[in-house]
């Protein structure tokens, strides 16, 4: 065999080893990036939001300790998702509230009352992780039974959350999170926060 053939094979074998080593490192780096990318380290840049509160339990279905635990959980998940995460509970009819907006939005059925309130609440407080009216989500859970016999909730999404969540995804989150809300409101709202974070970062 020609010495040149032997040298060539050694040359190829040498670089094949380094090529495979570099390829393996590149794959490991990509995996680490993917895992790290699931959580955000972005700082909140919205300076115009008029409140630091995220738990508005107007229906008084949570204890003070449960509210505080939710605030801690929400703060953690906000950093992970780079989204504001808000909870509002009510126990009142929204029929009169929604009627004010019918000239603008058209006739509203009772299941849409919560939509109007939730969207307005988000905008009025200028929620948004990156900017006012920016990235975030708000769950409005109204415990009141409207005239049609229904009890309604709404998931309001904005910015990146709106881009991420289709209507079917929002419905699925609400259905799963609020399945046992009557028996365990705190557990339901914890599930809302956790599910949103999972679905937002998966």
Could you tell me what each predicted segment is?
Residues 13-19, 32-202:
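Folded, non-transmembrane soluble domains that reside on the lumenal/extracytoplasmic side of membranes
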Residues 1-14:
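N-terminal Lys/Arg-rich, disordered targeting/topogenic segments
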Residues 18, 22-26:
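Alpha-helical transmembrane spans of integral membrane proteins, capturing the lipid-embedded, hydrophobic core
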